[in-house]
Amino acid sequence: MRNIRVLVFGATGTGKTSLCNTLTGRKRPTDNGARGITAKSHLYPAFQTDDCRIEIIDTVGLHESSQGTVPAEQAVVELIDLLEKARDGFSLLVQVTRASRITKEHDEDYKFFVEKMTQGNIPVILAVTGCENEYPMTSWVDRNQEAFSRFAYKELVPTCFASGGPMEEFFAPLRLQSREPLLGSIIHNALVEPRKLYGTGTSSSFNQSLTRIWNEFVAVTAYPYTQVMLHKLNAYVPL
């Protein structure tokens, strides 16, 4: 059976946790507030489809430390946690964005996860949420494909993963309608085997990867190094 490990990332409020819940059949809490709710990266239990075993990791938002969900001093702990969950590598990255203009946060998320953390070695697709007002939903991608041409996305997948509220009867079938093509894109675009970011068979150790990723995190979020952060980085020894 083919093993596919997927890292899902995106700015606060893009619907990545709702997307992960729908793909996995789980019910992790979601929040539409500005502060978000993904304060810690979460590894969902693996599920099977089409002779594939799929594991999904929902990441803490890159900008949530500055927006109140994750204190700055805890950010390094969350990066360590994410890197530990990356021990077995990834087969695919899924960036989640709303059906709107390309934001600064979108660019920074892409640079951090695609170019820096995984160094362009793992394919990435874009899941576009909020397409429920389009008919068909693919029309948004048709109109906006060119705007995303500067990114190395293998595919843009229009989706609706909204849930709850008075429109739930409208959202529910659209979530199911979105799940099948997104899963198909994941299976089609994922590497045959997960690719490791560090350790045996790579040119990087855990601590080298952590230092490189942390430096980029600081550059993107403009956090100053604090003594607490430096102590956590310097004292950490991977298991």
Model-found features: residue ranges?
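Conserved GTPase G-domain substructure that encodes guanine base recognition and part of the catalytic core
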Residues: 1-239
